């Protein structure tokens, strides 16, 4: 059995991520809503018809940069805390706009998702396409299971993620 925080790849697809879409689920399965990125990414990859590769990450910035290094298209999903109502979903094109660092102020890592994206941008190491989906969490304390609002949002994240994969694969043909 794989540890849920593993940074090792899990694949629904075949071959390197450069041939399909890399979906990175970020989170901690043992901190309630922090698991939303992991749960959404798993469900998205199970539902996807296209060639996708799932990678689960704890959110440590350098590991994220290494994960997307060879990828042409990346969808990254994580839980955030911005003060919006639980279950609020954000979509950002990380090549075109900055990811708010304040979303990750409660991260247990010194080098967050937002900082990894900012550094990769400065080093010209962003993948050609990097879409960030973030869901507003409610409970980040120890425990398992998502709060009801976040659980509902995961279903919507999967729907939006499937649309994103369709757009990416349609444009790469």
Tell what function each PLM region has.
Residues 2-137, 144-156, 160-172:
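N-terminal catalytic or cofactor-binding beta/alpha core of small enzyme domains
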């Amino acid at each position: 059995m794989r540890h849920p925080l593993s940074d090792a790849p899990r694949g629904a697809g075949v071959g390197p991520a450069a041939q399909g879409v890399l979906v990175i689920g970020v989170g901690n399965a043992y901190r309630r809503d922090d698991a939303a990125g992991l749960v959404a990414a798993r469900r998205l990859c199970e539902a996807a018809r296209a060639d996708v590769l799932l990678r689960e990450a704890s959110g440590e910035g350098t590991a994220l940069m290494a994960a997307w290094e060879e990828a042409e298209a990346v969808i990254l999903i994580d839980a955030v805390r911005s003060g919006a109502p639980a279950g609020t979903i954000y979509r950002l094109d990380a090549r075109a706009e900055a990811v708010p660092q304040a979303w990750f102020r409660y991260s247990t890592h010194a080098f967050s998702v937002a900082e990894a994206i900012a550094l990769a941008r400065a080093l010209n190491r962003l993948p050609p396409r990097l879409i960030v989906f973030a869901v507003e969490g409610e409970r980040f304390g120890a425990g398992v299971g998502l709060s009801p609002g976040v659980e509902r949002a995961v279903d919507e994240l999967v729907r939006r993620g499937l649309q994103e994969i369709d757009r990416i694969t349609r444009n790469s043909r």
